[in-house]
């Protein structure tokens, strides 16, 4: 043995017979910390300090430890002799248990160097038949034995096959290798979660082999070699199904559970839910071990286990017997948890990605693949109508502990493990309104050509709604508010609490509203409780469902209103059809003067004289002067004096120019003055003359005067 072998540490080799005996029957030590697990092919447990477990050879343990220390000192003093006769001397002198070796290591200088695994010579080969058969089956496999010496806290994996914590759960058996290499100085990427640990690795009959650091800190490979008469039997196909994920990744995941170390070893349900516990290999515990006797995995419900032969390549029928452990196959839910941290104490299934805990996942590790049967099951559940209906009625905060294999199971689980929310009506289809004719945005936008007439006038809107049912409406561009809209609505009857305003035609039960447009959206003017809507279609859609500030809900028309042609909203057609019954222009409103019982041209002349004789002339206001067969409507463009005033045709007496041809010259060019005489709204026995001046030469007042005169003549004839 070369002297370079002893530069950074000590190499101790055991006889093949003795190592095989100790590997199969290790003896626990009372000198190790409280949470130092040991394992054999028959049992699994921990050694608490207050209750140490002694074996038959415990009486000679002190003598063996002293002999081991003396021999180790001899090896340190005589490195040359050890190199020359290492094989013969070690085989004949060293005879002590694994626990005595651990005690000796704790007392020695803890500065060990990582030695290449290929230094082990042929003398490291085991001679027993079990190891020989394993060597033939897996010539390239490397056995790892991981024993924690001083552990400060628990760091456990949630993966069913990997663990880097002091509570190592070996899937099937203890290592069966010859050479033992002791080291502490392990590369950072391959170091386990605890800084002070011992790693025992063996090389099966290879003179030199490349170092495989990924296996040192991540996993203990599953081996199929078992002693005859062992109470645990490895199912066929299990080894190959589990080796790939064990050796393929170096990423270790920290446990999010706040419980102690021993809870993970004994399978406490405070650290892992039943679905996660069922995913661990059952043969790592025996019925006679302390772990299984104390917790027994909390008696998982056997009837609720979802057994699939394609999930973990195990027989579909679990072995349920008193002499053999129950084989609990991993469920699809548990497989999905293998890529994230264990669920919390509340059994919440919200996964925490590995990248949030340990950084980036290993790029070489393949993503978890679902079996074809599980994919079909997921697809069938997702497309099941009953499953979709059940999901919309309740919101589950915690998934059930039993795997769900059918929509009926899902129904039962959601009823017993969820907080039910009130039933919410389903949204109607966007193509057409629902059964109760509740419209949708698409339906409102598709029918906008029937209810949105931007070019029609107020009188045209009234004519369209005159013969329609209550709730019918039409929206047009406002002539007084630029950018706003006018809403004309047919109501059943005028509410008693809402008095008639000027401009409302009470005889036809048609009311008019202004829909303002601003940066916030469209809003019904004068209704503070009304929200702002992003578009006119949204305004109509909401008010067709709820009336809000309107007298009634809007009824969206599905045909042309009033039996008109589809092109009735064109400007040319509208002007032609209403040319004889309406006229309008912008004028300057001056003032209103009471003329007592006068009427005709004399009333206009007297009113102008009274106005001009005042010390302070009135301030003019631009208004829209509209004449229809129903009367005269004045709309203040700037809303300075009034909003809108309506004078019915039956209240009009006269309309004409100033007989003296006087002109108005304040704040504008000289313009002609005219006015109309109507019945006073405050004094029923008197008349009032309302004076105006032409605002624009392109809009002369002669047109509106002629129309009012013609309408008055028609009224006198009747």
Swiss-Prot record:
In the UniProt record, the signal sequence range is 1-14
**Which positions fall inside the SH2 domain?**
451-558
Its chief place of residence is other
Q: What are the entry keywords?
A: Actin-binding, Cell junction, Cytoplasm, Cytoskeleton, Phosphoprotein, SH2 domain, Signal
Output compositional bias ranges, type Low complexity. Answer: 208-219, 272-304
Which InterPro entries does the UniProt entry name for this protein? PH-like_dom_sf (IPR011993), PTB (IPR013625), PTB/PI_dom (IPR006020), SH2 (IPR000980), SH2_dom_sf (IPR036860), Tensin_PTB (IPR033929), Tensin_PTEN_phosphatase (IPR051484)
Q: Which Pfam families match?
A: PTB, SH2
The listed locations are: Cell junction, Focal adhesion; Cytoplasm, Cytoskeleton
Sum up the protein's function in the record's words: Promotes EGF-induced cell migration by displacing tensin TNS3 from the cytoplasmic tail of integrin ITGB1 which results in dissociation of TNS3 from focal adhesions, disassembly of actin stress fibers and initiation of cell migration. Suppresses ligand-induced degradation of EGFR by reducing EGFR ubiquitination in the presence of EGF. Increases MET protein stability by inhibiting MET endocytosis and subsequent lysosomal degradation which leads to increased cell survival, proliferation and migration.
- Assembly with partners or alone: Interacts (via SH2 domain) with Rho GTPase-activating protein DLC1 (via C-terminus); the interaction is independent of DLC1 tyrosine phosphorylation. Interacts with integrin ITGB1; the interaction displaces tensin TNS3 from the ITGB1 cytoplasmic tail and promotes ITGB1 stability. Interacts (via SH2 domain) with E3 ubiquitin-protein ligase CBL (phosphorylated on 'Tyr-781'); the interaction is enhanced in the presence of EGF and reduces interaction of CBL with EGFR.
The protein here is known as Tensin-4
The organism named in the record is Rattus norvegicus
UniProt lists the gene as Tns4
